[in-house]
Curated annotation (Swiss-Prot):
Organism: Solibacter usitatus (strain Ellin6076)
Compositionally biased tracts (Basic residues): 1-16
Entry similarity comment: Belongs to the bacterial ribosomal protein bL32 family.
Region (Disordered) residue spans: 1-28
A matching Pfam family: Ribosomal_L32p
Gene: rpmF
Keywords, in A-Z order: Ribonucleoprotein, Ribosomal protein
Name the record gives this protein: Large ribosomal subunit protein bL32
GO BP field: translation
């Protein structure tokens, strides 16, 4: 197995890790219940997508 010949510097390590940060999901507003939801997905609060009820939500 190959091993590193030299130690990587802190700058080189942090430069490589600069793109590893998690991005916040872009949320949109549900037109039916006005709760935040992920675009192009069923609303977890009311169960609607594109004006149709796709998932039946159980009331607690």
């Amino acid at each position: 197995m190959p091993n590193p010949k030299r130690r990587h510097s802190k700058k080189r390590t942090s430069t490589r890790r600069a793109h590893d940060a998690l991005k916040q999901p872009g949320l949109s507003e549900c037109p039916n219940c006005h709760e935040p939801k992920v675009p192009h997905r069923v609303c977890p609060h009311c169960g609607q997508y594109k004006g149709r009820e796709v998932v039946e939500v159980v009331a607690e």
